[in-house]
Amino acid sequence: MKKQIQSVAILGAGPAASALAALLAREGIRVALLHRPRAAALLVGESLVPAIILILRKLGVEDEVRSYGKYKPGAIFNMNEFGDFPFTFDDFCGKMPDYAFNVPRIKFEATLLNCAKRAGAKVFEIEAKVERVTGEDKVRLSAETLAACGDFFTGQPDLIVDATGRARVVPKLLDIPAREGGRKDTALFAHLDKAELYKSGYVHSSRLDHGWSWRIPLQDRVSLGIVLPSEHAAKAGATPEERYDNLLKNDSYLRTVTVGSKRLTPVMEYSNYQLVSSRLVGDGWALVGDTAGFIDPVFSSGLLIGLTSATELADAIRDGTPDAFQKYERGVIHHLKTWHEIVNYYYDGKMFTSFRVGEMMRKNPLIRLTFPHINKHMGRIFTGAAGKAAYSMAMMRFLMKYGLKNEDPQAMAIR
């Protein structure tokens, strides 16, 4: 049975929350974003992918993002003794934009939040309190929270959307189980005044003695993050700053690309683990963005999944039918699981072993003939399109199983 949703309360104001609010407000739906601003600015730089540019165009903010973003034509992966693997978007984007941007997260979030405000969404800077309805698979805003919203809502909103990220407010209230991945890593990140970059604008991902790192060139600095097994992070120092600074000095790769670099910011640290919620929708509630699931920062899939889920949830809300919400849930869970699979191929070494074998065999006439086709579909990993491309994923699975030519992928695994 179709339900016309006229009012929505969104918990949070991150990218997925703001994008969803903007899309719904444009449709005349009454939307409120309920969030308490962060005490500390999120320092990480975001490396966008071409698939996100399409969403920025839909929101009408591409030019604003371009004004402070660093033009990004591709990505480069360093695999130590196995060399560099550069990927240029122009080689395999097809109808998709052949570029993206690297952006400071705080400015990017402000752009999307202002977009939501311009569309008509109301922002309440409050700590929203949500309660479980006794004996039901349902939540509601507390009387205190409704009162803080003044007369914006006449009673409970038709839909409560949890976009609180890892806080996972609604899943915790409703005891919604989640599937966790096998990795338990620590991520450390900060901004440096400089770091060695092989290609201008490219995001650089590098295999380390333990774990891997990103270098995201911004307009006036470099965001450098390190992701490594938590047991190795703990050995690097007593504080996040000690751990980060020691890793820059002691890792055999990082010390070569940060010579003379100065850290400009404090170090932020979080647990990097993989989680996919088993349910994303229910009676009067839905999950979006990282609340629905998060995988890994490699390949910049997190923001892509979050913004894609926002556009798909907006479609479901406009439709209003149970089938539309179930379609949303199936689609996002499938997207998350697909990226989980892709990320695992990176960590277990199969992905870049396959790329290396392909390069080694290009003199073979058959390989030379089929290489452009294979390259186009494998390249969709880096544009963000792979998670929604069934044929590309089927080709990837085939190559991961049959395309390694007796090479041991452990040699290129992330340790």
Q: What residue spans do the PLM features occupy?
A:
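Predominantly flavin-linked oxidoreductase catalytic cores and closely associated redox partners
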Residues: 115-253
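FAD/FMN-dependent oxidoreductases across multiple families
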Residues: 68, 232-329
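Beta1/beta-strand and adjacent pyrophosphate-binding region of the FAD-binding site
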Residues: 2-14
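N-terminal Rossmann-fold NAD(P) dinucleotide-binding loop
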Residues: 17-18
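N-terminal FAD cofactor-binding segment of flavoenzymes
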Residues: 43-80
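Short beta-strand to alpha-helix junction loop
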Residues: 93-114, 234-238
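C-terminal helical "tail/cap" subdomain of flavin- and related membrane-associated enzymes
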Residues: 315-415
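Glycine-rich FAD pyrophosphate-binding loop
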Residues: 25-44
